[in-house]
């Protein structure tokens, strides 16, 4: 047998997991190719073995667990839950992250190199800038496709609840709410029924208000066999879902098999949901566990109550408990009803008073059955649950789903009483048309065939019945009869039906809501007695076979049936047949073997039916006799007299009952019970149908209301829901039709009851849809009214108030009052805008949306204008205050020295600067206020006037600068005479008495402190008081020390700093020219301002939306486009959230910019990723056809999206280089940070190309993404033994990879994998030969010894590689040492080495290292965890030299002794004793030749290069 090709294996696996494969193939194969190409390097076999086969087992387990709770159903989508026809639910590859919105997620099988593929949930991270992957644990497969699982995920999320699942399809990505996805659909196929099991099935657990208990379920529902599963499985009823009337399949006429399967065709079912009072996560999967059995058959063969209506519990096994052996185990695992808080009132009472649908005319267990009586059945409807109805199996639009969500509950309104389960689903029995007729008949044998016979005429006294009923009145929940329904919306609550609580031995006196009367025409007692039996078989000609067995002699008080009664019964039996069988007529078999007396009216009735009708009802009359026929038959015409042995000429044994020698075991009593209920069901259906049609006509004829109306349930629908007949029909209809299938004549009967029932179902569904449409129209009108009200308010009062803020006022007090009013107005507007936008969320009214946006923009403009006017008025107020205060000081100072000091104080006061005036003038021009411009001119004139007065007072024109300098020099000499610690006297004693009080300086003004020239003046004018003069000068509220100069660059006065700018105490150092410093600071601030402005523009550009690639691009280019946009989105988040704020924080300290860049070095590595993706896009776009390429270039966003990040990177580098030139030589740390930042930015382009080269490696089975960061990539000439070749070498943190340049694919280079080594096994010899370009890498842990000599293209490349490898090996050695110490401590050994007591000469090996050889290699050959001793730090190159004659074999030394020798070597190679415990390893400097230690930290010794044997094993490159 030939092995299956890989392609066929992949397709067969996908076809098994995702049926139908012809619909899912386009989506799945595209995902397969994507994963094969990206993850498995186009290796289909490895993909199949490592990914697809494990994924198949994982997905099969998920599917099995999800479908286990619906055992017995026929799924509408056969691939659920993995796919819904062409829509794939569980993805095999990642979806484009741009399609994810808040609340969206999707499931994916994620490949992994280290382990088997796993299932993961992918969604947007809380920040929104990246995709978050949440692994799904294997134990979650049992409840993955449940609402509870997603609720558990949402509990762990801080923000943003997940609710919508993404499905991939050939047409694109689809969105489906999780609540709908976890609810599978079930549909009919080939006219067969679907549902749970062919029995009375468990009701749903209502999801009522909190605190209401859940009712236990009857155990009889467990005894059914699911089709195809091979074992009995419990059926699960939906929990709190929308329930409708079960619909019935119409059989194909003329087909006995199809007629036999007449029943439900559309069972709309929503799976179970967790009830409000649930006790656990899996409560929805255990809706059937807490159940009470109804008992088994009595020993005398009587059927227990409920068994007459349950086919599942009795068709395959003697009792419901035996039919499902797991039922008792499941029941034992559930707590009792009392422990769960379930009150006895929530359960119904089994017995005569309140029997469930599963009960017929029988009494409680242990009570003999009373036949021929129908009065006790009238009370049975009181104990049946209520159901709900609505919806349709066909899918609705999303709009309909949303609007129908409120109406789902309409048909299942809860009543204010206790809960009662009220739903019974139906199961579809799939029958194979190719089976033998006998096999199909055997499958449909009713429960009565295996029931032992019991005398039907036995009837106990009435007292005995009551006594047994009193004993058996126990709380019992009964199954309802309505079926679940598929409806693609949210689940609704389950109806609660009022139940009777029977206390003591009294029965409820209340009548049921519907009085179900017996049919006054059909004699059901006659049917139940076995007088007329429609056997369900046919004769040799295909006519339906009906047997007549006259009863024994009647009691005197009982009268014989009349001719009309007999004729009516026969006509009723004939009417039950299918239309084709009605045309053929009946074959009557009159059994007179026991020679009973014939009822007088029997023969006239038969004769009448033989002659009447066209065609006649009775086509053939066969009389079975034992001896001579009775005298009454002598004159009867058209009868055939046969003996028992001649019956085979009439019908086959399979068509006859067992007392006639056939194989059929019939139960006339059971048949009569079922058909009596069917007759009452038809009466109910007709009444409900009339009521529903009237409601439909009323809804269709209702005109739209002119005034405002409340959104709610329409009144016609409320009337229908309040009709008790609908409740009774929902409660019993489905179960009755289900029981009808268990009758022995069901395959011959027509679809009349099912058609009528389905007609009611469709009418109710039409009513619900009309009601939903009405509610939708009401909500649309309500939303339209809300929008209109908001628009009217905006155009009326809102517009008036907004216009009032256009001219806010010309005074500060008025503006402040206006600001308060504007805040209240803005809050009101925002509330109305939010209300209108919520109403427009489901509409596409662009005009109204535009009106709202325009008004909001005008509101923002008004707010901006108001704030600018406030700022302008505050400036005017401060300027006037400064002028008034200065004028008052000058006026109050008088003349002389006091006036001079006041002028000096005002000269240093924080006057408004010229720049501030220009800024305020620009504000006034923007506001367009002439009054503001006039006020600005007035303020400027007053300030200039005050400045002129100050200049006049000081007399600067007559006072030369040299005079002030001479006074400054004299002040310096006078200060020296006072002593070094003598403080300068203060001017506060002169300024404070004449000053009205200190004032705080505005932040935008500057303060120029007093210089030394005026300090001397202060010395002369202010003698010391009490020997302790004040140490500071208090000027306008600011304290400045007398020995400190505070410089503000915005101060217009410069002469103050001239006296001390060049001294050693100056703030800028010794001998730096002041103007040069100012120029440098100004340039630095200019560069930082330009950098911040550039960053703001860049953030704005990144926030612009970027369109998705068009369909003309290849799938690979679209994926690369998506990856580039993903990196761009992460850059947007980083720059907008973090980096811009940090740059703004560096505005006052320009030279800190370099540290800011270095602090976010990891984030700037994203630019390398962007460079990689951009180069791939450029090469891919260059390979496109000219037409496609031209269409791409026409897109305006493509060039900016591709070029903007790299242009910004170059702009960063230029600004940092200029800032580095402006930094003084004395700022060494800042210059180093700036230089490192420039280098970081320049490396990104090269790192991006390196990453692109890593992806271009072909044939490598190692996942290079898991080998750490790529450190270097360069071409080398590699020498291995006698072989010399050119290789491109990649150095990762954990791997060294050799590759060969192959060529270009689509404009990019590709490399072929040759060899790879773990860096943990690597040793380094830094110098080989005399060229200065070679170094050696060797590996001890692999074979005997492998060594590779690498010749670089330049000394710089060689130094770069050796330095990086040395640092890498040092880090590994230090890390391994720490791990080894931890292991020793955990073993109780400790971290101090054990020292043998030996002679010093034996322990000292360093003396051997003092030889002077020309050159040798110092490298490392010890692997991880081999030795525990600490390493020797600080070794110099000379200390590691060995004599040339020493061979490597001579150094087979005890490594532990080497590590225990606690000695250090000085730089000259001499031995010096060291500490007992050496310090930790320190990496060498990049330029040094210190040997690099690999894992273990033990110094290994190697011989010279020329002494290596040529026979050493090597690995070909």
Curated annotation (Swiss-Prot):
DH domain residues: 1083-1251
Q: Which GO terms describe its molecular function?
A: guanyl-nucleotide exchange factor activity
Mark out the compositionally biased spans (Pro residues).
200-216
Biased amino acid composition, Gly residues? 353-363, 384-393
> In terms of domain of life, where is this protein from?
Eukaryota
A Gene Ontology term for the protein's cellular component: plasma membrane
Q: Which residues form the PH domain?
A: 1263-1370
Q: Which residues carry this modification: Phosphoserine?
A: 262, 415, 929, 959, 1080, 1431, 1436, 1472
Bias-annotated ranges (Basic residues):
370-382
Q: What does this protein do?
A: May act as a guanine nucleotide exchange factor (GEF).
Question: Which named protein is this?
Answer: Rho guanine nucleotide exchange factor 40
What species is this protein from? Mus musculus
